[in-house]
């Protein structure tokens, strides 16, 4: 639990640094980045705004009702700013870990918690298809299909030539024949993927 919390904390601050100073992680030549934040952007925006308002509201409340407790104002301010930066870092963590398509393969990600590297030779086809999943979990498996959803949505289907094993956050998933995931611009991702696919199989 502590190790997981620490990894989250480090990842958020690194992502915040990369986003603030516009220093994205390098990618291979010919690769493109594709975001997947759009469905949850409004929610993240609300949390960030609320966190900022809370800082001011708590500071004013302490100043008004407990004017002699200067130390409490300082503590509350530090915690409030940390919480605000944490929320911004959460958004940055998604923005700085986009999906990638490039010469070496397709890379499907979900912040720093999931990173699937799929060589093109393992893929039969990549196609657009919008789906809404009833289960609200981000990572789902149903039979031989794995879904990486954002706000219960997926937009791209990846069909493998043969069953593969995917390294998921809760452990490896063997015998997977299809991966579904969300991306903000599925048509562009699929079009770029098609330029790398070898003898794509139509389905």
Walk through the language-model features, giving the residues of each:
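Conserved beta-hairpin
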Residues: 84-130
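Residues that cap or initiate secondary-structure elements
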Residues: 114, 124, 132, 164, ...
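A membrane-cytosol interface segment of integral membrane proteins
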Residues: 144-203
């Amino acid at each position: 639990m502590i190790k997981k919390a620490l990894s989250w904390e480090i990842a958020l601050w690194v992502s915040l640094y990369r986003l603030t100073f516009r220093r994205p992680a390098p990618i291979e030549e010919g690769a493109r980045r594709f975001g997947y934040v759009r469905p949850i952007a409004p929610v993240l925006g609300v949390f960030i705004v609320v966190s900022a308002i809370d800082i001011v509201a708590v500071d004013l409340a302490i100043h008004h009702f407990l004017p002699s407790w200067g130390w409490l104002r300082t503590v509350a301010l530090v915690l409030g700013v940390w919480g605000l930066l944490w929320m911004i870092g959460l958004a940055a963590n998604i923005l700085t870990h986009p999906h990638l398509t490039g010469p070496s393969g397709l890379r499907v990600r979900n912040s720093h918690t999931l990173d699937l590297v799929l060589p093109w030779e393992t893929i039969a086809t990549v196609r657009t298809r919008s789906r809404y999943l009833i289960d609200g979990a981000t990572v789902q498996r149903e039979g031989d299909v794995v879904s990486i959803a954002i706000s219960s949505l997926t937009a791209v289907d990846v069909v493998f030539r043969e069953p593969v094993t995917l390294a998921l956050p809760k452990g490896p998933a063997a015998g997977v024949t299809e991966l579904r995931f969300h991306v903000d611009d599925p048509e562009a991702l699929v079009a770029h993927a098609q330029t790398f696919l070898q003898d794509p199989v139509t389905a």
